[in-house]
Amino acid sequence: MRPNYDPRVDQASTTIGLVSAVSDSALALSSHRVRRDTLTIHEPQRDSLLYVVSGAGSLTIEATSANLAEGSAALVLAGEQARVELGAGDLVILQATIGPEADRHAPLGPREVVVDVDAASASQATGARSFRALFGPHNGSTRATLFVGYVPPGRAPWHYHLYDEIVWIPKGPGRVLRRDSEDALEAGTAFRLRPREVHILENSSRDREMVLLGVFTPAGSPAAAYLAEE
């Protein structure tokens, strides 16, 4: 659930693995804290979806440059080299990587490099839940969808998805319930949900919305959920 090994530290940045790669999944998740200068993102065979947790800076891919701020996301395709430059203060970025074995969705729109969560359209999910799709087939990410989800107090019924997913929680409290386990969701918690894994995601607050960041493959709609027996 939480990082359980020491970070790799150099003079400019710290990298922590949050959800490690496994043999039967195309997804992995890590966190970068940029302290000074620049961070280079380059994955020869894996697409990268970035999300800014805190701080500000800029991202450059070849001749394209865009500003980064808290709540913005970026797409770096396999083989591209992106340069992240630090603004004021530390810059904390999540990096989800997607391997070439992931099925590719047909593109549904032109590629974007950086998007802001406030500019993404809001859509309804199960019950009163909603989400904003940051990246997906609509803007260049054909192997995975990256979204921010909004969970009101309470819980959804037992359900599952057909996609493989990693979820990161910026702020709790909450719980993820599986048929045979229950885990607390606190700030910085990250976990994996396998295809068809029956679960409940609960917001334990009485009066505050819980926010989550999710990435899944194959790309599609976060609203695609299927009810399971109680």
Model region roles, listed by residue range:
Residues 38-44, 85-86, 155-161, 202-204:
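Short histidine-centered beta-strand/loop micro-motifs
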Residues 23-25, 60-64, 87, 152, ...:
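Short strand-coil-strand connectors
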Residues 1-40, 69, 89-143, 226-230:
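A short, N-terminal "cap"/entry segment at the start of jelly-roll beta-barrel domains
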Residues 130-163:
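A mid-sequence, solvent-exposed acidic-amphipathic segment
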Residues 78-103, 142, 186-187, 195-222:
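Ligand-binding loop in jelly-roll beta-barrel domains
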Residues 44-59, 148-152, 160-176, 215-217:
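Short, conserved beta-strand element in jelly-roll/cupin
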Residues 63-81, 180-196:
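Short acidic-glycine-tyrosine-enriched beta hairpin
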